[in-house]
């Protein structure tokens, strides 16, 4: 079986440039025939685009990670729009909501999360405009507030945009909320852990044509 690899960060400094060819060869030897490398900041985008131009089987998703919104200018969308029209950009992202990490210095949690939601909505607007999919990150210290908020925003655009919720951990009712909107779920190896019963249960009940695989490498 040939597998598409839904989510990695080949432009990360943890991958020395001279090792990329060998990495892609190992992936091919393990039946991974396509990869999507994701940008997480404006500065990160050119390197990701370059990788797609150098390798036929590498594609990109371009966006601003929620933990980077505080240092991303409010007019970011015009730059992102230009980049995202590259022919090998297949999605907008990685975007989303991260309530796990504390607000940076000078920001309250309320202001930080408000900007994340604003930027997520702008990413959705761009995806709708360009006819591209979107890749969503959510993370909470406890509970599922970020996922609930992201799903609520997705519901505003689900007739125009298909979302992939990456590194999905479950439980099944969260999966259903996303699947009901037409979204996809991307699972990591966590689904194989003995204690990750919610993740495994969600994966087992995700339709075959709505499931994706990843490692979020190198993280």
What are these language model-derived features?
Residues 1-219:
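Mid-domain alpha/beta scaffold segments of enzyme catalytic cores
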């Amino acid at each position: 079986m040939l597998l598409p690899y839904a989510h990695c960060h080949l432009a990360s400094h943890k991958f020395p440039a001279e090792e990329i060819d060998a990495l892609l060869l190992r992936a091919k030897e393990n039946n991974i025939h396509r990869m999507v490398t994701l940008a997480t900041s404006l500065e990160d985008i050119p390197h990701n685009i370059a990788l797609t131009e150098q390798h036929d089987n590498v594609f990109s998703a371009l966006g601003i990670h929620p933990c980077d919104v505080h240092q991303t200018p409010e007019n970011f969308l015009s730059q992102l729009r230009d980049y995202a029209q590259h022919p090998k950009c297949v999605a907008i992202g990685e975007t989303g909501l991260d309530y796990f990490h504390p607000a940076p210095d000078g920001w309250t949690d309320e202001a930080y999360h408000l900007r994340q939601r604003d930027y997520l909505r702008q990413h959705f607007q761009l995806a709708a405009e360009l006819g591209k999919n979107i890749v969503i990150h959510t993370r909470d210290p406890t509970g599922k507030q970020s996922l609930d908020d992201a799903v609520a925003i997705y519901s505003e655009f689900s007739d125009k945009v298909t979302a992939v919720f990456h590194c999905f951990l479950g439980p099944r009712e969260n999966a259903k909320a996303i699947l009901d909107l037409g979204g996809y779920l991307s699972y990591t190896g966590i689904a194989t852990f003995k204690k990750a019963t919610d993740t495994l249960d969600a994966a087992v009940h995700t339709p075959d044509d709505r499931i994706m695989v990843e490692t979020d490498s190198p993280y």
